[in-house]
Amino acid sequence: MARKRTLGGKAPQAGNKVSHSQRKTRRQWMPNIQTKALWSITLGQSVKVTISTSALRSVDNAGGLDNYLLKILPSELTPSMRRVARQIRERKAAA
């Protein structure tokens, strides 16, 4: 699975693995990315996202996907999530 996320803002980190003898070997630490279907109450449907586990906790703390997308800056979202956030804003404004 590609380590690309639609929510979460995490990217692979690079660094050195250091052994007991202090030999340094380059390596990458990959974020814990999961594919989930999160329910949008406003849209009345599920939205499939690839999300880091820390962002999944943030979604839970915000009270759901709708509140999280309304709270986060649009510049931190991918184009597909910006589209979903715009749909949520339009539905909430119409209601």
Swiss-Prot record:
Gene3D superfamilies: Ribosomal protein L28/L24. InterPro entries: Ribosomal_bL28 (IPR026569), Ribosomal_bL28/bL31-like_sf (IPR034704), Ribosomal_bL28_bact-type (IPR001383), Ribosomal_bL28_sf (IPR037147). The keyword 4Fe-4S does not apply. SUPFAM superfamilies: L28p-like. Keywords: Ribonucleoprotein, Ribosomal protein. It comes from the Bacteria. GO terms for biological process: translation. One of its GO terms (molecular function) is structural constituent of ribosome. Residues 1-28 are annotated as: Disordered. GO terms for cellular component: ribonucleoprotein complex; ribosome. PANTHER family: 39S RIBOSOMAL PROTEIN L28, MITOCHONDRIAL, LARGE RIBOSOMAL SUBUNIT PROTEIN BL28M. Belongs to the bacterial ribosomal protein bL28 family. This is Large ribosomal subunit protein bL28.
